Amino acid sequence: MKNQHILFGICGSFCNHAAVLKEFEKLCEENDVQAVDSENVFTCNTRFFQHEDFISRLEKASHKPVIHTIVEAEKVGPSNAYDIMIIAPMSATVAAKMVLGIYDHPVTLAAKAMLRNNRNIVFGIASNDGLSISAKNIFTLINLKHFFVIPFAQDAPFEKERSIVSKWNLLEKTADM
């Protein structure tokens, strides 16, 4: 994948941020990438990352400030500046919001704007209940026009039999349509 204008949404599943960050940094080497983060990603310190460190790495790789407000995300539609959107990781909550048309945070509003512009959205799911109550929304997204899923599997089938995580090493290959 080269010379693409990529909008890259980052949501919860904080334990997946390190793996997703590697893929983000690789995409930035040969593409124009703009990060858009959920409020929690932008503000929460977790056992996996201090938010300042995570944001700093995104901005260093992309050479752009992270979009992190509704006001900033609203500009995505009229600008029509992006070829594709990647949302990784996408939480089950964000999957539900997308299916139900709830655009109340930066990533979901940016995704709505991409759909308005007839652009594709590639998403990587990470959810402890992806094969349980959240399966309905995840599989609904998979069947909607303009949505493509990064292949996923159970991440701990004997300890967390309902948990699924996308194979982050297939992110770029999935997005390179």
Language model segments and positions:
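A cross-family phosphate/adenosyl-ligand binding-site feature
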Residues: 1-121, 126-177
